[in-house]
Every structure is written in structure tokens, then in C-alpha cells.
Amino acid sequence: YVPAKKGYSNVINREENRGAIPPSQGYILVDIRKCQGCTSCMLACTLVHEGVENPSLSRIQIIQNPFESFPDDVTIEQCRQCVDPACVSVCPTDALRANAGYGNVRMIDRTKCIGCGDCIEACPYTPSRPVAVSDEKFNDDLKVRKCDLCADTPYHWDDAGGGPEGKQACVEVCPVDAIKFTTKIPVQEGDEGYKVNLRGTNWRRLGYPIG
């Protein structure tokens, strides 16, 4: 992906927003030792958001490397809903914001997105969690997508439990329970807080969901 118009981040400096953005009230945790690489989560993600099963439109990514050995042959890459979200801070049109109506999840308003790619460049993770794809709903213009914890879908989460059993689509369909949702802020250092052993008693004592 090459940003459509390079230079927005140089023109509009939004660093003053950093630290003033409220933390998300929800996070996705994954256990790559459980993941089988079936991509059910990717298909479910696109089905509930776009109405089609298309991995290219998925907000959660399964990365497979046949040259690696277990458990590094398959990994799950999900948006971290960062406590200090650089993607939100650099968006020049306020298309990417912490949505208070959905627990401050970092969401993209595609009607405001101009496809500049600033959020993709600002994301500290590889592959970047925001993904730019041509959108047929907007004359095939580039629009960015990222995980919104199924906000504004039947699988959204809220204080009342949200969708079916309060589960996001990816959590609901995973056949090996490799994906879990938590309201506790994970450790904000690399993968340590997000890629966890979901069977471990230490996580149960801390109040994290395990399977």
C-alpha cells in the first residue's frame, strides 16, 4: 500500500492530542499456540462488517509462514486499541476517533476518511493494524478499516453484554477458543499483554478470560 497523498502528517501535526484520548474499555487477546490458521475469524469479521466473506477486507489478520516451526508458523495480528493511539492522533480529518458511544473503541468514520494513509504509517506494529482497501460503497476510493470490536454490528459489546452472548464475531466463531475479549487494559509492551496463554491460571487470577 502506498498512501494516496503523501505529506498530510507533515502538514497537520496532531501531537497535542496524544495523552488526551480516553482508553478503550475493550481489548482482544489471542493465544497463538491455540490458533490453527483456519481464518474463520477473518471470514466472520468481513461478513458482519461488509456482508461478504472476503479475507482482504478483514480487520483481524492471520499470518502463516510455512518455513517457521510451531508456534511461530501461525500468528494472529489484531488491533491493540492502544492506550496512546498514534493512529487517532495523526488523522487529519478526525475520521479515526475514540467513540464514546462504544466504550471509546478506536473507530473509523469512512465518510470522513480520505485514504491518506497517515494512520497506517503511524501504527507502531507490522503489519499495520489499519488497512486501506478500495471501497465500492465510495466509488472504489481508498478507505481505511481497522478492528472496532464489532461496534455498530449485531456482535457489538456494551454494558448489557452486546451481541450473542456478548461476543465479538471473531470470538464467537473461533473453533479452538484462541481469541478472547477483556475489559482490562493489557500490558502495553510489545506482544506481552496481547498474545497470551489463555489456559494459564495466572491470567485467571488477574481476571482475564481464559478458555
PLM ranges: what are they?
Residues V2-P23, L57-S58, I63-Q81, V90-T93, ...:
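Flanking helices and flexible, charged tails adjoining ferredoxin-like Fe-S electron-transfer domains
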Residues G19-R33, T39, T46-R59:
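N-terminal cysteine/histidine-rich coordination modules
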Residues R106-I108:
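Interfacial segments of alpha-helical transmembrane regions
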Residues A44-C45, V90:
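Phosphate- and divalent-cation-binding pockets in alpha/beta enzyme and binding domains
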Residues A95-A98:
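Membrane-helix exit/interface motif
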Residues C38-C41, C119:
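Conserved phosphate-binding and hydrolysis motifs of nucleotide-dependent enzymes
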